[in-house]
Amino acid sequence: MKQTMYKPKRSFRRNLTPIRRHLSPIGSGDRIDYKNMSLISRFISEQGXILSGRVNRLTSKQQRLMTNAIKRARILSLLPFLYNEN
């Protein structure tokens, strides 16, 4: 007689640890705008590059709006394209 080997069934219970939602660094009253320099400066690195969405903890829509606002501010000379080390 041939015996078959059965795998034990896995239980599909999830861990009961609560999932923490990360709060957005942009408040509900803050508007993403190229004129809002205090907000924009938080999302630019020391070299002047735009920080990624993972580093910023922004949603993809917020990151897209922030990128466009930073680029507009650079074109209008409100922000430098690169920060000099000197």
Curated annotation (Swiss-Prot):
One of its GO terms (cellular component) is chloroplast. Gene3D superfamilies: Ribosomal protein S18. GO terms for biological process: translation. Part of the 30S ribosomal subunit. Keywords: Chloroplast, Plastid, Ribonucleoprotein, Ribosomal protein, RNA-binding, rRNA-binding. Disulfide bonds: none annotated. InterPro entries: Ribosomal_bS18, Ribosomal_bS18_sf. This is Small ribosomal subunit protein bS18c. GO terms for molecular function: small ribosomal subunit rRNA binding; structural constituent of ribosome. The lineage of its organism: Eukaryota, Viridiplantae, Streptophyta, Embryophyta, Tracheophyta. Belongs to the bacterial ribosomal protein bS18 family. Pfam families: Ribosomal_S18 (PF01084). It is found in: Plastid, Chloroplast.
